[in-house]
Amino acid sequence: MNQSNSTFKNMSNVNEALIKPFPNSNKIYVQGSRKDIQVPMREITLTDTIGELAEKNAPIHVYDTSGVYTDSNVNIDLRKGLGNIRVSWIKERNDTEILTEFSSNFSNERRDDVQLNALRFEHLQVPRRAKDTKNVSQMHYAKQGVITPEMEYIAIRENCKWQEYKDQIGQKKGESFDANIPDLITSEFICSEVAKGRAVIPANINHPEVEPMIIGRNFMVKINGNIGNSVLGSSIEEEVSKMIWGIRWGADTIMDLSTGKNIHETREWIIRNSPVPIGTVPIYQALEKVNGIVENLNWEIFRDTLIEQAEQGVDYFTIHAGVRLKHVPLTIDRVTGIVSRGGSIMAKWCLAHHTESFIYTHFEDICEIMKQYDVTFSLGDGLRPGCIADANDVAQFGELETLGGLVKIAWKHDVQTFIEGPGHVPMQMIKENMDKQLEECGEAPFYTLGPLTTDIAPGYDHITSAIGAAQIGWYGCAMLCYVTPKEHLGLPNKDDVKQGVIAYKIAAHAADLAKGHPGAQIRDNALSKARFEFRWEDQFNLGLDPDTARKYHDETMPKQAAKTSHFCSMCGPKFCSMKITQEIKTMNVDEIAKINSIQIEMDKKSAEFLKNNSEIYMKKNT
């Protein structure tokens, strides 16, 4: 990864495609109880209905993950990073301190290496840590009944002004499978859910740029997007661009899964420019530190890596602590064995040393680190099935049972925790996964990779997995990890990232509708109304991907006049069902009365026919 200072100077000029506002959309901010709680939303302006059904159409407000990148009033300079919106909240709590240097030996070595000057983020911040080993987690505050600014921010964000449309929704009743979804999300409800462990707020004290969000089954289903370099390619600039691209289209969190060179510097650039929580798999970097030799991994190296990443601002760690020595033989008869990178690393280490992993034996030590920075556990499913033939087997569920025990330990330390899940699971076996996770893990939030519902579609696994994602999201899964078309095939590019995010936004929204989440149907109703009224621009702009919708329409009807026509190229002007229905709706009273009178006469004739034993021909009276 040979990048020069000149390369990063160019990063101040962000690609226009990454930051241009969505069409007919404005970034608005809803203020909370204090001036520094400014909650972003995207307001989509709609055109008026014209003709005999004329009326004004109110703007629609949608949840927005794109940060300031789509705010036309903000100048973006990636070299400087984002504004620290949470810094005053963190300071006010008076339970953290600014360190004089990094606590990680590796971080200090990287800082002092002049050869890295060309790669380094220019404005390194000095890290914070809890004072006197205090606990600074959102769960710790919640258990004390403290409603933090982060919780208030999230309450405003989750409601997304939906009550303004309450009388217009006509929302279909959902099936939430015993979830506890209120009509209105309040700060108190969020505090209660976090205290019970049913929701998490990933918000490291060293990531003050993050816009607070929540993951839990009683909230909107969230999605994660994966990025990261590999030994075969990519650059820091490319990975930062992928992050911005992913959140533009709706990724609620981003995982940096880098396994190539300069992982530390890549992560710093991503975090400093990310308004969404960032997750990592620390064992990847720890393995790089021992030159890829699994047997040489140890607790000291892993501990230093955790501290290094916590002080950079990583919001959640995937930790494969549930892979036990006794589980490894259970995978022998599988078709695809162990497919998790982290899981295979820990399994190999356990076999090499013939003992439990240092992650499992030092789990409480890890908890002590997590609560000093408010890093959230994402307890990894290292033994997830890699094909539908291996779904729901004894190895997978054995690990899940171990994770259930680890959740209780994490909660004892007031460390926020969610659980990772499969994988490849056929549709008829998906609900068992959700039910067992709720039972074993005390309703801690579930986070799944899909699951993929069939193995026959390489190149289309964003579709095979979105099917399972929608299903498990309906059953109660709190966050869905996207899958791109490149899954199993290669490192995704920007276009793959977009396709994966859009597929999973569809799955998450479908799950919200099925659960009956309050306000979930507002956008659907607005788009359906625009479609019926041939307001083409509104149709495009209300969609998850206005660019693609407009492109498909214009391929056959490119002229501007086509944007006001009352038909599309599918049916043409004579066979459009909605045009015909509109004509029916706009008939005048006399026409409708005439039709009704004809119908009355027809009904009379029908009754007469039935009275005469339904005879087609009747004898003539002589």
Swiss-Prot record:
GO CC aspect terms: cytosol
Keyword Chloroplast listed: no
Keyword Manganese: no
Binding annotation for [4Fe-4S] cluster: 568, 571, 576
EC numbers on record: 4.1.99.17
Binding positions for Zn(2+) per the UniProt entry: 424, 488
Cofactor note: Binds 1 [4Fe-4S] cluster per subunit. The cluster is coordinated with 3 cysteines and an exchangeable S-adenosyl-L-methionine.
Protein family per UniProt: Belongs to the ThiC family.
Job description of the protein: Catalyzes the synthesis of the hydroxymethylpyrimidine phosphate (HMP-P) moiety of thiamine from aminoimidazole ribotide (AIR) in a radical S-adenosyl-L-methionine (SAM)-dependent reaction.
Name of the protein in question: Phosphomethylpyrimidine synthase
Protein source organism: Vesicomyosocius okutanii subsp. Calyptogena okutanii (strain HA)
